[in-house]
Amino acid sequence: MNSEIYLSVVIPVFNEEESLPPLCAKLRDALEPLQCSYEIIFVDDGSTDQSFAVIERLSGEYEGIRAVRFRRNYRKAAALAIGFKEARGEIVITMDADLQDDPSEIPRLLEKLDEGCDLVSGWKKKRHDPLSKTLPSRLFNKVTSMVSGIRLHDFNCGLKAYRREVCEDALPYLYGELYRFLPAIAHWAGYRVGEIPVQHHPRQFGYSKFGTKRLLNGFLDLMTITFVVRFMTTPMHIFGSLGLLSTFVGSLVCAYIAL
């Protein structure tokens, strides 16, 4: 990371060609009044539509846009990991590309950082999603909050603000589904974690990437977070435990797919 840029916005993208133009316009409107140097990093996670072509076109229309492209879909953790590595800012904002996260919330996230937080997570207090997404998410958030010891309402919100050092320390944990637990991991590492309510909008284009298989992933995530909590103070143990867990998880997923 390079301190010449103050703010980096990292946005994973998967098949969001229609959302990208209005998203860039909203980002410009939110970021320009801040009067700070910024960059927008789109990570195309193996899109099969014209998302990357749209990003390339937009990079000629807007200043500060950078793009990373995966040849296949590696999922959100990998997209965030490469985004964190590429980010040059002192502050990193993450958000989704589907227009459900509102860029106008970015100044409020920065204000919360100025109050002394190292990571600020958005809370989709009034969520515009079907029950098939909201009910599992509520259960996940409650159990994760109890297990981790950090009282957040919404671990899953993509809209977050990080100080640079939090991103650097989070990189070893950005694989699988562990990106969901970055607030908890930051909390265990001694960083101050805060939360603010943020606007959440209905999806305008495309379709949700949420599927029934993610219900299984949710239960497996709970197992993972239990291992993380137990072994956070003994880093060498966590990799062996998570390795065993990954083998078990892989077996379950294969069995699930075969059904």
Language-model features: locations:
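Conserved catalytic loops of nucleotide-sugar-dependent glycosyltransferases that act on lipid-linked
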Residues: 75-84, 100, 104-105, 126-251
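Structured catalytic core of nucleotide-sugar glycosyltransferases
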Residues: 1-133, 137-138, 143, 162-167, ...
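Aromatic- and Lys/Arg-enriched surface recognition patch
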Residues: 255
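Membrane-interfacial hairpin junctions
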Residues: 258-259
